[in-house]
């Protein structure tokens, strides 16, 4: 857009006027020059980006984010203005960074440990100063994070391998539940149910209706994505956000019922089990006065949605990549046979599965699901020579950074990109530092366990030659396949058998 190309400039009006110019023209030119200066001026910034344009620039940049989605808009602006640039969201200065050195600086410092988003939007979805994912109150976030870290490490991490494998095998034995009339597998639904079942087994342990909860999780995610950066005026028109409010309420009500049952069971027990699960830890924290009941429910909600929301889509993309790259599948199967053999995968196998690990890393680099991180500066700072004021919003465009620096073949899917160790400043699928993903270690365990268990039993194939590159996707808060425009089903062929589910 033309307005976005108008950057702050210095005009020397008199040098542009010919000597023979009529005297009456001079005031007009001076006024025009003054107008242009005001038009493009917000306070001179050394950071590249669209012009302020008497407030029109911020409206256009925010509008672009709402129209294109956060991820697509970030890629657009980085292409237009470079890897460190400035826009506005809700009138607030926002930096979009895809430069590794700048990203490293932001991730490692505590004064970037807060997130940003519409306060009204976060209140609507229950994340404003609650839970862990978008809790932008650093003090309250520090109260909940240790509870998540404890649940996602130690005994929970060790048990995850067996729990994942058992859950997946159970669901694979009931494939007809996610198989259509043509014999094609609804892989995303399968993976989401497995992820939810695994999370419930480890962290809540209350019987639930998987399909109903998975459906409500998708509705909640759609609301979260839609409301995160909406302007305040949006929330003054009830019919605009009513459907999102209902989607949020549906999931929150379901979690309330599950947690009420958990509280009832805890009260009925004479003695707590030796290994206390996450839900019990939350309820005990509530009884101590550390957390409110509402915050407890929000923490449980976020623990249950994390894997079905992001990890299931990551695994879905991985299966599509395996289907397109038989040489990669062959290398993975060879390693599985060598490390695991004919038995079930165990915790001791996880570190030995290097080919599987490199495949996961390359998949997350080449086709990420979460390819951006949103932060807020809590104090004045300087990043790579650019001044950053307290309160500045920051979006780290991780997906773009993974395609710009270090990797020998950044625009290709190949395990050669991880043939040698990659310095962690150049590869951050989970982030690092004080606000890194709390579940980054257990996520790797889950993905390895799922891939080994599934690929040992089935060869996977896409429909009609569909591949990751050809899938229609939405790129907003996260990058998801668009089920309305692409064929997302797959064919599962049992290994060591001529029988195929497509027949």
UniProtKB/Swiss-Prot annotation:
It is found in: Membrane. Its cofactor is heme. The keyword Membrane applies. GO terms for molecular function: aromatase activity; heme binding; iron ion binding. Substrate binds at residues 309, 374. It catalyses: testosterone + 3 reduced [NADPH--hemoprotein reductase] + 3 O2 = 17beta-estradiol + formate + 3 oxidized [NADPH--hemoprotein reductase] + 4 H2O + 4 H(+); androst-4-ene-3,17-dione + 3 reduced [NADPH--hemoprotein reductase] + 3 O2 = estrone + formate + 3 oxidized [NADPH--hemoprotein reductase] + 4 H2O + 4 H(+). InterPro entries: Cyt_P450, Cyt_P450_CS, Cyt_P450_E_grp-I, Cyt_P450_sf, Cytochrome_P450_Monoox. It is a peripheral membrane protein. Disulfide bonds: none annotated. Its main location: membrane. GO terms for biological process: female gonad development; lipid metabolic process; response to estradiol. GO terms for cellular component: endoplasmic reticulum; membrane. Heme binds at residue 437. Keywords: Heme, Iron, Lipid metabolism, Membrane, Metal-binding, Monooxygenase, Oxidoreductase. It is an enzyme of class 1 (oxidoreductase). PROSITE patterns: CYTOCHROME_P450. Its EC number is 1.14.14.14. This is Aromatase. It comes from Callithrix jacchus. The lineage of its organism: Eukaryota, Metazoa, Chordata, Craniata, Vertebrata.
């Amino acid at each position: 857009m033309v307005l976005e190309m108008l950057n702050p400039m210095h005009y020397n009006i008199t040098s542009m006027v010919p000597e023979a110019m009529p005297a009456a023209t001079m005031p007009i030119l001076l006024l025009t020059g003054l107008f242009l200066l005001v038009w493009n001026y917000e306070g001179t910034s050394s950071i590249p980006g669209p012009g302020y344009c008497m407030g029109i620039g911020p409206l256009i940049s925010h509008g672009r984010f709402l129209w294109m989605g956060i991820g697509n808009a970030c890629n657009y602006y980085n292409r237009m203005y470079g890897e460190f640039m400035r826009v506005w969201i809700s009138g607030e200065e926002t930096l979009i960074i895809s430069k590794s050195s700048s990203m490293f600086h932001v991730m490692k410092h505590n004064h970037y440990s807060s997130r940003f988003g519409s306060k009204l939007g976060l209140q609507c979805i229950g994340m404003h100063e609650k839970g862990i994912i978008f809790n932008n109150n650093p003090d309250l976030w520090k109260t909940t994070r240790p509870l998540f870290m404890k649940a996602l490490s130690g005994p929970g991490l060790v048990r995850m391998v067996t729990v994942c494998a058992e859950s997946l095998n159970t669901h694979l034995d009931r494939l007809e539940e996610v198989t259509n009339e043509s014999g094609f597998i609804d892989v995303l639904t399968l993976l989401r149910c497995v992820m939810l079942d695994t999370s419930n087994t480890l962290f809540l342990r209350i019987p639930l209706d998987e399909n109903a909860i998975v459906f409500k999780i998708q509705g909640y995610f759609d609301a979260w994505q839609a409301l995160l950066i909406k302007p305040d005026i949006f929330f003054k028109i009830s019919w605009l956000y009513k459907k999102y409010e209902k989607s949020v309420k549906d999931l929150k009500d379901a979690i309330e019922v599950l947690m009420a049952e958990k509280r009832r069971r805890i009260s009925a027990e004479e003695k707590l089990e030796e290994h206390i699960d996450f839900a019990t830890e939350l309820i005990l924290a509530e009884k101590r006065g550390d957390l409110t009941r509402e915050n407890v429910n929000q923490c449980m909600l976020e623990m249950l949605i994390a894997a079905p929301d992001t990890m299931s889509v990551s695994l879905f993309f991985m299966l599509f990549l395996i289907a397109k790259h038989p040489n990669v599948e062959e290398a993975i199967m060879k390693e599985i046979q060598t490390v695991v053999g004919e038995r079930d995968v165990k915790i001791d196998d996880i570190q030995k599965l290097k080919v599987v690990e490199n495949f996961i890393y390359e998949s997350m680099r080449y086709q990420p699901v979460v390819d951006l991180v949103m932060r807020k500066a809590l104090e004045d700072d300087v990043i790579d020579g650019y001044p950053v004021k307290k309160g500045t919003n920051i979006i780290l465009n991780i997906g773009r950074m993974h395609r710009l620096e270090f990797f020998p073949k950044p625009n290709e899917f190949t395990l050669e990109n991880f043939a040698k160790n990659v310095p962690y400043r150049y590869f951050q699928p989970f982030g690092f530092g004080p606000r890194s993903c709390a579940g980054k270690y257990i996520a790797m365990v889950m993905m390895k366990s799922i891939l080994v268990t599934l690929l040992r039993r089935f060869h996977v194939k896409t429909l009609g030659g569909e591949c990751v590159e050809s899938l229609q996707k939405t790129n907003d808060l996260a990058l998801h396949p668009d089920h309305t425009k692409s064929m997302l089903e797959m064919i599962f062929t049992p290994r060591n058998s001529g029988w195929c589910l497509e027949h």
